């Protein structure tokens, strides 16, 4: 079971993916289903139109913390409930190794449009060519749940904000194991951008709904 965190995040702290899934499902049903009377009849069918909008889940945290694994588990679990899920990895948006701030701003614009029911376009970053790649468009009318995973995710407009944490040494090992030696010279470079981002959006990160510790 989780405990209430008194540290960074001030949200519900847990290491149980099932608790996170339960929270996301309750939020999804709370947004899409109108309040009912004791007979189960809607009290005000015009109160909200959020059923036409996707639930946006932001999964944030420093490199190697376990964001990608959590997003995969949530995608699998929500899909098993019959819910259509789209995962957006911010790694595909950051414009290179110095692009964390710019990528976060791009995601903020995307998420604002989606939350208003408007289509949102972005250009994928081609890491091999170190250049902009193809353009993609997300149509909120065609999505039910969107999971945004990456550093800066909860700086966007999200219905659920999840902050993933792990010890620095473990994060480093995971990152190198995942990306290989090509990441090693960029570790400190990226970490400095993470620190700057967390400082710039400290109030937003303090409002995380859930803190998920992977170790």
Can you name each region flagged by the protein language model?
Residues 181-215:
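Small-molecule kinase domains that catalyze NTP-dependent phosphoryl transfer to phosphate-bearing small molecules
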Residues 1-15:
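Charged, amphipathic alpha-helical linker segments immediately N-terminal to NTP-binding catalytic cores
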Residues 62:
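P-loop (Walker A) phosphate-binding loop of NTP-binding proteins
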Residues 86, 92-140, 145:
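Conserved nucleotide-sensing/catalytic segment adjacent to the nucleotide-binding pocket
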Residues 67:
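Conserved lysine of the Walker
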Residues 134-179:
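ATP-dependent NMP and nucleoside kinases share a basic, alpha-helical "lid"
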């Amino acid at each position: 079971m989780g405990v209430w965190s008194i540290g960074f995040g001030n949200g519900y702290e847990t290491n149980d993916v099932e608790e996170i899934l339960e929270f996301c499902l309750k939020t999804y049903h709370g947004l899409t289903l109108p309040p009912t009377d004791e007979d189960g009849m809607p009290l005000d069918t015009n109160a909200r139109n959020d059923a036409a909008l996707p639930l946006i889940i932001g999964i944030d945290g420093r490199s190697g913390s376990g964001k990608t694994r959590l997003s995969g588990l949530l995608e699998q679990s929500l899909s098993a409930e019959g819910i259509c899920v789209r995962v957006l990895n911010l790694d595909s948006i950051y414009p290179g190794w110095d692009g964390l701030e710019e990528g976060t701003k791009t995601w903020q614009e995307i998420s604002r449009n989606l939350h208003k029911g408007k289509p949102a376009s972005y250009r994928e970053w081609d890491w091999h060519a170190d250049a902009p790649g193809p353009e993609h468009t997300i149509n909120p009318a065609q999505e039910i749940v969107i999971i945004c995973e990456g550093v800066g995710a909860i700086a966007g407009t999200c219905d659920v904000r999840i902050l993933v944490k792990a010890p620095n040494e473990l994060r480093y090992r995971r990152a190198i194991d995942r990306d290989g030696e090509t990441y090693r010279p960029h570790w400190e470079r990226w970490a400095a951008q993470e620190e700057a981002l967390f400082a710039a959006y400290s109030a937003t990160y303090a409002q995380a709904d859930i803190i998920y510790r992977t170790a």
